[in-house]
Structures are given as structure tokens and as C-alpha cells.
Amino acid sequence: MAKIIWTRTDEAPLLATYSLKPVVEAFAATAGIEVETRDISLAGRILAQFADQLPEEQKVSDALAELGELAKTPEANIIKLPNISASVPQLKAAVKELQEQGYDLPEYEDAKDRYAAVIGSNVNPVLREGNSDRRAPVAVKNFVKKFPHRMGEWSADSKTNVATMGADDFRSNEKSVIMDEADTVVIKHVAADGTETVLKDSLPLLKGEVIDGTFISAKALDAFLLDQVKRAKEEGILFSAHMKATMMKVSDPIIFGHIVRAYFADVYAQYGEQLLAAGLNGENGLAAIYAGLDKLDNGAEIKAAFDKGLEEGPDLAMVNSAKGITNLHVPSDVIIDASMPAMIRTSGKMWNKDDQTQDALAVIPDSSYAGVYQTVIEDCRKNGAFDPTTMGTVPNVGLMAQKAEEYGSHDKTFRIEADGKVQVVASNGDVLIEHDVEKGDIWRACQTKDAPIQDWVKLAVNRARLSGMPAVFWLDPARAHDRNLTTLVEKYLADHDTEGLDIQILSPVEATQHAIDRIRRGEDTISVTGNVLRDYNTDLFPILELGTSAKMLSVVPLMAGGGLFETGAGGSAPKHVQQVIEENHLRWDSLGEFLALAESFRHELNTRNNTKAGVLADALDRATEKLLNEEKSPSRKVGEIDNRGSHFWLATYWADELANQTEDAELAETFAPVAEALNNQAADIDAALIGEQGKPVDLGGYYAPSDEKTSAIMRPVAAFNEIIDSLKK
């Protein structure tokens, strides 16, 4: 039997799965397709790490490793929902919950090395054995033109800007080499006195692979940050920091610590020795510092110094004004790819402590991609907000296969312990890359393999040809890595028929301006980018165009011939879960799942000639468009339609479409009674689903909710369940 793998993940998409997956299973079965769940949730991955220490009845398999292997085969057809990229505080909370549920797990401090495997963004790099094709589906774009989301007005007097280093950072210190032959290199630190320390003893590289090394200077970073704290205060705007501490799990928490210490420079000048000795260096955020002060004898005195620092420093952008949670409280609370587009959409403002919006200084220390956001800000200051009813679209073709570029750098990122040099040394002793570094600098290496680069260029040409859109490679001539990539892109473009296609290479700043000039004219442009800009652009443009990145179609054509279908580019929405717990209303929009599912069925048609799967896909697309037009998407407000209601209406419209289509008589016959039953009971089922809302519920866990309790909450109406379950019989 053909098989689609549906991933069990975390938070809002996990809750939605309890409601949606039974519908998907029932419909898929009519095309001879089995839908199988694999658990790659944070809780599931933690338990898999310690399977050797758990009793037989508690053991779970390493589903992520299994899916990683499956992704390298032509059989792969995986629907991947958003999962938690865990920060240390999230990991500790999940471990505590599992311990309370009876799992004998060690404390984080006692098994840091093993837990490291589940911190940060560990899921996507394992599954992404292909490059990325993300675009706004036509149905969604059409819907937004009819029902545009709110866009904040921009003022020509806006004081909002990006602050970035521009020197002594990752961008400016980069060196890059294309390997002539396969080799295994060593990364080592040579101290000023000649002492050698091996940082990575064996790094195998393939012929044609691009290897980079770069570093950010700690001294330059500190000087830059002190200037920005002063600048925000002088300009009377919010101070905000925008990092990606989840994905860049080694470098960005260190940089975040520098930001916290710069903002509270006076506190660290007075109490720094004691704070650092207690491990309160800011790298886990202000919340962790406050928690740690309780254990210090003079904790109250130091807390008062922090309060004074907040009072005297520039106002901080807030994550939750009501609860006093600032931008600096938790490193994973403000994630650049979501926070910057949200700010641009909100008139260039962020929320202040009085719960009002205010202009902000967006501090993005490394200048590699900061210019993209500054370009959009300047354009909005000059030309006003974008208009969702007329604007063009910017789909993305992203290089990400086999842990390309920065998003594969964690195991090659090091905090430098002493002044000296870092060298990347070939097996014959040649030094390929060398940097002079100082204590505290952050040095990192990135790898980009040749086969993914070739596949990326091919995918860009294919998308340009199929869509008829111009395609622009975003490559920065000021960066050594991008200069090497430009050489390879030009070489591989020559292997393709590009006659009649508009393909060019621009720097990220030029490419941004080019794309937004065209957007304002209602014209479409494919952005062809590396891995980080893939991440940033597939939030930036969708949030401006569609109001959210969760409505993107995200396809990863796997290099071995399988398919990975990602549901939206947003996160796992912890606030949505909070609302369920408090008032049993799930506002998560499963549109991303609907779009991915249609593509997954289409993949079965294209690879296995399963025509029934093709009919399911087309009917699902039509049902999704109807769902949008009939305004059956979840509301944010309790007492109105939520995620469960949208699943009911999708099932109804999908059954209607299948009953009424003429391509497959057997499917039409199967779905006629289902459609009739759903339509006959529609008013009652809809009312019953809404009637469930308005009271607190117990999921039996947050990271590892109880299947029984959560299923009852997410499938509360027996009449609907019976109709769906009858399809499986």
C-alpha cells in the first residue's frame, strides 16, 4: 500500500493533527493510501535519545533518524508540520513534564551532551535532502486580494532603522575555498605561544564542495552594541535585538549574551564577576538571570540594579507588555525571520511597555542579511505600506539540501578561548583558511556541497520556465562565499536551456529593491537564495503579501526522487495552545496542511500513476478555495469558528467536490453518501463544535499531551466522527 508519512510535532500543529488526521486518513484510504504518523515532537525526540535507559514499555524508536533515511529514498512522501526548535528553557520544561509522567530522565545539567542533540533546529536539516520551492498558492493570493489583511500605515518621519556592524563581523571576515579534490580537513586553534588545540579533528569534504570560515570580533561587537544602546536612548525609540537563537544555536545565544550585557553595562561593571561566576551571562536571557539571582545572597540588591538599568536605559521592545516580558527575556522569543516582517507590517513599529506601538532600532549585529530589512524599511518610509490587493508575489527557490551554508554550521562553531589563529588545514598540511582571532571571538565554518548547488540551479531554471517569472540569484559580491557561489551558478546555468528566461545575479540589497519595485507594480519575481535568505524571505514576503507565512506552499523535491511537503513557514504557535487551555478555542489555521496534502497526493499521481490520488488532490484544492471564499477559516475569538470547525467544513466541501467530479466514478459513488450526511447535519455539527468552546480544558500535558484527553477535546462531536470513520470501513 502506498504510504504518506504525517509528522507528529508540537504545540498548535500537534493539537490540529488530532482533529485533521482522522479526516485525512479516511479520505486517503479511498485512493489506497495509508497515512502513518511518525513522532518527531520535542518530547518524542527526548525519549528517543534515552531509549537505552528506559524500560521496554517506555522505549520509543528514533523516528527522526528513520525519516532521515527515508528521505534519501525514492519512496519518501512526507508531510512535515512545524516543530519546536527548542531553547534550553523549553528543553528543561519538556524534560520536567516527562519526568512527572513517569519517565526516568536525567536532569539537563547531568547529560548536556546527549540533550544537545534535541536543542535548536535539529529536525529540518535531517529531512531536507533536497532544495526548497516555496510559493503563495493562487487560491490564497486571490483570496487576499478580495479580503486584504490589515497593513499599518507608514510615516515619512518614521525613526525606525536597522543597526548592523558592517565590519569585523561574519560577513566581512569571510574566507572561502572550492575544494579541487575530496579531502578530510582539521580545524585547529594555534595560540600566540604556539599551543595547538584541535577544534574539529576530522571534517570530510567532497570534490567541488565550498568550505568557508569566518568570525565575529567580540571587542567590535561590544563596542557596536554600546553605541546602539546609546543611539536608541538618544533617538527616543525602542531598543530591539533580532537573532535566530533557535537555528543558530551556538553563535546566536553567545551574541544574545553580549546584547544583554551591553544593555546592562553598569550592572555587569559592578557585579559582573559574581554574575559570570554564577553562570548568569545573559546567554539564556534576562528571565534566566532573574531566576538565578534567587540563589545569590545579594540577589535582591543585584535585581534592584537590573531594575535601575531598565529604568535608565532605552525602552525595550516587548514580547508581552502585560507580563513585563521584554525582547531580552528569552533568546528564542524574538526570532528575526518572524519579528522583522511583523515590525515592517506594523508601520515599522514594535510594542512598548505601555502596550503601544513605537518606532524601534532593530539591532542585527552581523551585516550579512541586515541590508535586506533596511532596504524594505527605507522603501516603506518613502513609498508607504504595500497594498495586498495589488502587490506582486516573490516565491523562493532556496539552497538548503545537505545542511548547506550557515544552517549546518553548529558543529563547526567555536567560542575562542585564547588569542591566536584558527586554521582549516588540509591532509597534506596546507592551510586552506586562516584567521587571526582574539579571546571571546566566535569563529565558524560552513559547508555547501556541489550536488545541492547543481540541483538548486536546475530548480531555479525549472521554476522560471514553469512560472514565466524572472528569477534573481541573491548573491553578495562583498562575501567570499557568495563570490564562489556566483562562479558555480554561472558555470551550471550554462548546462541549461535558458533561452527566453530572465535570470540575473544581484546583491541582496539590490535584489530586495528590484523585487519590491516590481511588487509595487503588481509584478512577480522568484528570489533564488541561500539557506538563510530562504528562511528570511519565505517569512518576509508572505507576511507582507498574505498576512502570514503559514499560508505558503512549501515543497522540497528530494534529490533521490521522493517528496517532502512542509506546511507553512511559520512556527508552532505556543500562544494558540495557551488559548486552548484557557478557553478551548484553537485559532491555528491548517491551510498549510491542506496545501501540502494536495501536493503530497499529486506526488503519488506523478510518481506511482495513482489517478485516484490525483482526483483527491484536485478536489482538495477546489475545497480549500471554497473554504477561503466562504470564510470558514478559524477566528481568533472564542465562540466563533476555530480549527476544528474549519476541518469540518473542509471535509464537507472536499466530499462535495469528490461526489460531484466525473473523472472517477468509483470515488464519486463512495463520497455521495458522505457528502449528503455531512451537509444534512452541517448546522448541528457546526453549532456543536462552537458550543464546546469557552471553558478551560486539560490536555494532560503540554509537550506530551495525553492522546485520550486531547483526542476527546479535538474530536468532540460524535456525529461528525461517525461519518468520517465510516469511510475507513
UniProtKB/Swiss-Prot annotation:
Monomer. Belongs to the monomeric-type IDH family. Catalyzes the oxidative decarboxylation of isocitrate to 2-oxoglutarate and carbon dioxide with the concomitant reduction of NADP(+). NADP(+) binds at N83, S85, N124, S572, H576, R587, D589, R636. Binds 1 Mg(2+) or Mn(2+) ion per subunit. It catalyses: D-threo-isocitrate + NADP(+) = 2-oxoglutarate + CO2 + NADPH. One of its GO terms (molecular function) is isocitrate dehydrogenase (NADP+) activity. This is Isocitrate dehydrogenase [NADP]. PANTHER family: ISOCITRATE DEHYDROGENASE (NADP(+)), ISOCITRATE DEHYDROGENASE [NADP]. GO terms for biological process: glyoxylate cycle; tricarboxylic acid cycle. The keyword NADP applies. It comes from Corynebacterium efficiens (strain DSM 44549 / YS-314 / AJ 12310 / JCM 11189 / NBRC 100395).
